From Swiss-Prot:
One biological process term in Gene Ontology: glycine decarboxylation via glycine cleavage system
Protein's name in the database: Probable glycine dehydrogenase (decarboxylating) subunit 2
GO MF, any single term: glycine binding
GO cellular component, one term: cytosol
Pfam families reported for this sequence: GcvP2_C (PF21478), GDC-P (PF02347)
Domain of life: Bacteria
NCBIfam families in alphabetical order: PRK04366.1 (NF003346)
Function: The glycine cleavage system catalyzes the degradation of glycine. The P protein binds the alpha-amino group of glycine through its pyridoxal phosphate cofactor; CO(2) is released and the remaining methylamine moiety is then transferred to the lipoamide cofactor of the H protein.
SUPFAM superfamilies hit by this protein: PLP-dependent transferases (SSF53383)
Protein source organism: Listeria monocytogenes serotype 4b (strain F2365)
Encoding gene, per UniProt annotation: gcvPB
Residues carrying N6-(pyridoxal phosphate)lysine: 274
Catalytic activity, reaction form: N(6)-[(R)-lipoyl]-L-lysyl-[glycine-cleavage complex H protein] + glycine + H(+) = N(6)-[(R)-S(8)-aminomethyldihydrolipoyl]-L-lysyl-[glycine-cleavage complex H protein] + CO2
InterPro entries xref list: GcvPB, GDC-P_C, GDC-P_N, GDC_P, PyrdxlP-dep_Trfase, PyrdxlP-dep_Trfase_major, PyrdxlP-dep_Trfase_small
The entry's keywords: Oxidoreductase, Pyridoxal phosphate
Amino acid sequence: MNLEETMPLVFERSIPGRIGFSLPESDVPETKASDYFEQAYIRSVPADLPELSELEIMRHYTNLSNHNFGVDSGFYPLGSCTMKYNPKINEKVARFPGFANIHPNQPESSVQGALELLYDLQTSLVEITGMDEVTLQPAAGAHGEWTGLMLIRAFHEKNGDTKRTKVIIPDSAHGTNPASAAVAGFDVVTVKSNEKGLVDVADLKKVVGEDTAALMLTNPNTLGLFEKDIVEMAEIVHEAGGKLYYDGANLNAIMAKVRPGDMGFDVVHLNLHKTFTGPHGGGGPGSGPIGVKKELIPFLPTPVLTKKEEGYTFDYNYPDSIGRVKPYYGNFGINVRAYTYIRTMGPDGLKLVTEYAVLNANYMMRKLQEAYDLPFDQVCKHEFVLSGNRQKKLGVRTVDIAKRLLDHNFHPPTVYFPLIVGEAIMIEPTETESKETLDSFIDTMLKIAKEAEENPEIVQEAPHSTYVKRLDETRAARKPILRYQKEV
């Protein structure tokens, strides 16, 4: 039975005339919309909204939520997404009246506590990353990437170095890296990976030149491998006059152990909604702060939060700033959660996060390599990439394995990424999962590998137990239906 057979759309449940609210008679004169808006902006007919009782609304969305899956539901090993548990103390603090009930248009003097939290969070992130200054304005990871690249662009233009139009990106990089570079107005140059899954330094030397604006790197990279030649790569890029950009997607693998700033990076962006336990996976909100070294501080987006004798204030006096990149001052609620997490864990706790994240990933990798191909057989960091090529020869593809995991109440790992690995299966267990959970997932993956050999049809036709079976994902991506259209 499919979900659409048991759960109609909320529009399809609608009964004309049914209401879910009652209001007292208005005690002020009624006015017409035409008194305030031009006729072009006024509906000619009422909006076709669902008409339901409050109880029907509650049941509809509660039932929908029961078919959803999140970190609180089960294991979510989505590689490169750091789907760790989000401590509920974060939610409690974010709901403090002094945080939840304030408005960004209030006078600075009335929100000094909130500004102090933001300033302290900036200071903590400076220490964690090894940068000299941090802005909390960017709203998410890719937004942070773009902001950091715009700073680099502004830096080069300020120095009259307008020929630097190219950003170098590894072939194993996140897809957002080349996209962000292109949106920032740069041309993308790809540097190859070597046989060990690391940046090929010899190839980097070939592509670096006077037109290089920056090299974007994730370290550890998207294969979960630490770029051991990072210091040499930094020297190569800096000698050519370029900047080194750190994609902080994988900071969970090195946090409180090593710092991007100490490796030679000039700009970093962080994903507070990932590494620092803001809830994510539902489309937002996120938080993608960037940190910079001293020579890039003048180009930070304004306003810049500063501390003076009289208190905390926003400084707009940055004539070389790239300007605002978001209304107001970032996604405050996610920043509160990240601050709470950092203060709760402390330096020693953050170090343990890294150690357990790396331990869990290596434990799983060694347990699974007997049944799946391991393209790069070496110690990994927080995540690792398997290949389903062995199963593909039996007629079972990686997408089939992912769908079969749904029958066992596991969210699938990231699949078919990074692109340099055929039939890729990228697994990131995070530090918050127990050995029992890891073992259960391992056993299931081994069982699926055995099914691929002995009964491939059961894997090829999965999932069997979910309300929604296989969707036409290609059609959904290319011809999405984004709004309800009533049948006439």
